[in-house]
Regions:
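C-terminal "cap" of GNAT-fold acetyltransferases
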Residues: 2-3, 42-43, 98-134
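Short coil/turn segments at alpha/beta junctions that flank glycine-rich nucleotide-binding fingerprints
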Residues: 78, 95-98
């Protein structure tokens, strides 16, 4: 896992993240990737200096609402998703948040299974879990 480097997103990351999204999903949702929006937090995972995935979230009360976790198809199975979740959860804990909620489609069985292995339970629009209190 040590070759995956995660960092906070920067304003200049938008084009590269949109390319990743287009590669994985066909059409990029340009509104979903806004590292320059002060209401969003974006974490970028890199492998060998290239973007391998990202997570986009926002705080809603005591909940970190994760709108998207995306890993490039070529980089799946290389612990990119685990590292992004580690960063999301650490961000939530460091801000005293109580829960993480991740949007994931019901039909996306591989993602739901991945989150279940990480302790997330199904909820109305995705999965969620409580954060530890430090």
């Amino acid at each position: 896992m040590s070759d995956v480097v995660v960092r906070e997103g920067r304003a200049g990351d938008g084009p590269a993240l949109r390319r990743l999204l287009a590669e994985a999903m066909g059409e990029p949702d340009t509104d979903a990737i806004r590292p320059d929006d002060p209401g969003n937090v974006v974490f970028v995972a890199e492998l060998g200096g290239h973007p391998a995935g990202y997570a986009a979230a926002r705080v809603d009360g005591a909940v970190l609402v994760v709108d998207r976790v995306m890993v490039a198809p070529a980089d799946r199975g290389r612990h990119v998703g685990h590292r992004l979740l580690d960063w999301l959860e650490g961000y939530g804990v460091s801000r005293g948040l109580q829960r993480v909620r991740i949007a994931v489609e019901r039909e996306n069985r591989p993602a739901r299974d991945f989150y279940a292995r990480r302790g997330y339970a199904a909820c109305d629009d995705g999965v969620e879990r409580d954060l530890p209190h430090v």
